[in-house]
Amino acid sequence: MKKRIISTILTLGLAASVLGACGGSGQAEGTKKAEGTSPEKVENKADGEKTELLLWMPPFGTEDTLDKETWENILAPFEEENNCHVTVEIIPWANYEEKYLTAISSGQGPDLGYMYMEMMNDYIDMGALEPFDSYLSDADKEKFYYLDKGVVNAKQYALPIVVGNARVLYYNKTLLNQAGVSKAPETWEEFKDACKSLKGAGITPFQQQWGDASKGSLNELYFPYLWQAGGDLFTEDGKEAIFNSDAGIKAAKFIYSLKEEGYLPDSTTSMNWNEINEQFKGGKLGFCVAGTNKAPGFTEAGVDWDYVTTLKDARGGTFVAADCLVLLSGSKHKDLSAKMALYMLSGESMTKFHEMAPFAPVAKDEEYHDNEDFKKIYEEEQDSLHVLPAVKGSAAIYDILYKNLQLMMLGELSPEEAINESAKYANEALAQN
């Protein structure tokens, strides 16, 4: 993350280098395709000679080789049909952003890659990504569920491939029954009422990981409540932070009130997610917020659980991942790479991928293969799902916001101070973009 932020400040000459070779086969630096010239004319190979493509993907299987083998098997028919060879490289999560930064700065990036929204805008800003708009037919646009989540600056810079792991409010049905809570809460007020009943029965109502080192915890700790209060993080153009609205402050006050009223234990300020996970699995918590991918562990632990997709204040809202395929502008084979992206996103390909990594379908030509318990989230509650916007420098902004909210939970800042100071930093940073 730090390397990415530094790169946006110092530039590192990336705007020039993205015109270099991608996957070892890029066009010469400084050259441009003539307007109206079909990229296919640039990409034609001598009869019988295979076109080489480089694909970067992250690991989702139990080990890197499983991912590599899965994608190689999925892409084998595509290779045969298009006289090409696809080199699949699995990039570990631990150095994912650094790998992209280093490779693209030296002109050695892939033809087609996988990015999450938070990292995307910096590469768009430096011209490293090519929009997919000209490669999508009307039928494609009708087929895909989440194309809007890959639109940045009014262009289709990304095609969502993994949309899921929504953050939901889990509850322990056994504990709620013991506390006399007969109905799952739907609103903030009902949630507090349920917490009051749990506390009265000697049960820890709720827990949050305010001691966790990762600012990604905001996906559970603050962002859902901001959206539920009717707020948002940034203006649509990404030029201004607006989480210091009345809704943003209301969300912070609500969270802090849970601690003030004893529904969040004092230990919340030192807790990390793994500790909360173990507490819920151990039947010690009434509620926790977590991704849908945590459900199998809860079931295996013997917890009689259910969930609420989102509490409501002004509206419903919760975080969902929307990770995407991106087309690198330095690729010499854009047409074929875009064609490969659409092939990977076809129902047949996604069905094979989801056998390894269960996620919700991204298009209408695939049946639902994820946990049936969460099917309604993606089919009936899409309007409540929010992704983090692709805003340049947002990682540093989230870091400051998280630290100030942690200070709020420690009682060192008021909710107003935590939000307003974070927004002040954010808008000063955004003004430099």
Q: What is the meaning of each model-derived region?
A:
Residues 288-304, 313-403, 431-432:
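C-terminal lobe and pocket-closing loops
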Residues 91-99, 118, 186-192, 267-281:
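Short helix-initiation/N-cap motifs at beta->coil->alpha
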Residues 130-144, 148, 206-213, 229-250, ...:
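Short, solvent-exposed loop/beta-turn-alpha elements that line the ligand-binding surface or hinge
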Residues 86, 177, 260, 380-433:
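Conserved C-terminal helix/tail region of periplasmic/extracytoplasmic solute-binding proteins
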Residues 194-197, 237-268:
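Glycine-centered hinge/linker elements that transmit conformational signals in sensory
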Residues 4-7, 22-122, 141, 183, ...:
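Conserved N-terminal structural module of periplasmic/extracytoplasmic solute-binding proteins
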Residues 123-128, 146-184, 210-236, 319-326, ...:
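Periplasmic solute-binding protein
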Residues 45, 49, 116-167, 192, ...:
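Hinge/lid segment of periplasmic solute-binding proteins
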